[in-house]
Amino acid sequence: MKQLMLYCRQGFEKECAGEIQDKATQLEVYGFPRVFKNAGYVLFECYQDGDADKLARELDFNALIFARQMFAVAAEFTELPSEDRISPILAELGEIDAFPVCGDLRIETPDTNEAKELLKFCRKFTVPMRQALRGKGLLLAKENAKKPVFHLCFVASGHCFAGYSYSHNNSRFFMGIPRLKFPADAPSRSTLKLEEAFHVFIPREEWDTRLSSGMWAVDLGACPGGWTYQLVQRSMFVHCVDNGMMADSLMETGQIKHHMVDGFKFEPDRKNVTWLVCDMVEKPARVAHLMGEWLIKGWAKETIFNLKLPMKGRYDEVLQDIENLKTFLIENKVKFKLQAKHLYHDREEITVHIQVLSNISPH
């Protein structure tokens, strides 16, 4: 197996390609990315047979910013007959000894308007395909979350890629996209960005301790309150920092304090803030440095923030800002865990999460 499939946001194929090239090289896997403009995916072509499996196993999926999902490609089918798509797939995969027995099946498409027209077909195709794979011993009789995931990605009605991902090193979401519903009472759609970030960055079993009621949070650039809404829904108390107006529905909860000041000048009077969130429209380097300042001063224990991306050089900007932030924290002897992702609800921006692992007294 020489190909690795990576899903990404349409229009960000170049950034996804640059990232997988860098990450593969770090693992001494050599090859080149095959980029299709606005396709919503990138194919990384490895020179060595078996290297796609190595990447699927060893390349930390959570370390990828622009990829929503990745899987090793075992076979590509370009002219599947509409009357019988299953038989050619089974015949080809039956010849591949290295294909693992899988515990789940996902029949997906890239996230483009053209490809998503195939989703109705994918849903209908799933049941007979699942039965056929089980009959051939390629899929277990019962779903098993510990086994690899079988992926079929259709880019056209007769054109698909078949492969697998490892359950410990993939996105657990169909197409790599969490399915979230916009709350009718939320002040803005930006609320879904923070909700998705919680799903992606924080294990569900840790929500009760890391996103618990009674915590204090700070929201920089809060107006009108899309991100604050998520914190209030979790029964937190929030310092909302913005010169604009907050939604009346949030003010009426009694859980927020509105500070009409510049987010870059605000200092919390309370020293028990757990969460710092920030979605300010500012230069990404400036926002990243501000987040670092808060963390080294012990003003917050965890932060989720967005970095707005420039029109050109987006990948380079991301690398530089994150590297500078890491260096700043390390120089100030802060132990931390950092993750970054181009979320489904992000557009020209990425979302970064940092958890401080050091015990820092606020100062």
From Swiss-Prot:
EC number of this enzyme: 2.1.1.186
Gene transcribed to yield this protein: rlmM
Gene Ontology terms: biological process: methylation; rRNA processing
Keywords: Cytoplasm, Methyltransferase, rRNA processing, S-adenosyl-L-methionine, Transferase
Catalytic site positions: K308 (proton acceptor)
Provenance organism: Vibrio vulnificus (strain CMCP6)
Enzyme class: transferase
Organismal lineage: Bacteria, Pseudomonadati, Pseudomonadota, Gammaproteobacteria, Vibrionales
Record-given protein name: Ribosomal RNA large subunit methyltransferase M
Homology family: Belongs to the class I-like SAM-binding methyltransferase superfamily. RNA methyltransferase RlmE family. RlmM subfamily.
InterPro entries hit by this protein: RlmM_FDX, RlmM_THUMP-like, RNA_MeTrfase_FtsJ_dom, rRNA_MeTrfase_M, SAM-dependent_MTases_sf
Gene3D superfamilies with a match to the protein in the record: 3.30.2300.20, 3.30.70.2810, Vaccinia Virus protein VP39
GO molecular function, one term: S-adenosylmethionine-dependent methyltransferase activity
Quaternary structure, from the entry: Monomer.
Catalytic activity annotation: cytidine(2498) in 23S rRNA + S-adenosyl-L-methionine = 2'-O-methylcytidine(2498) in 23S rRNA + S-adenosyl-L-homocysteine + H(+)
Gene Ontology CC, one term: cytoplasm
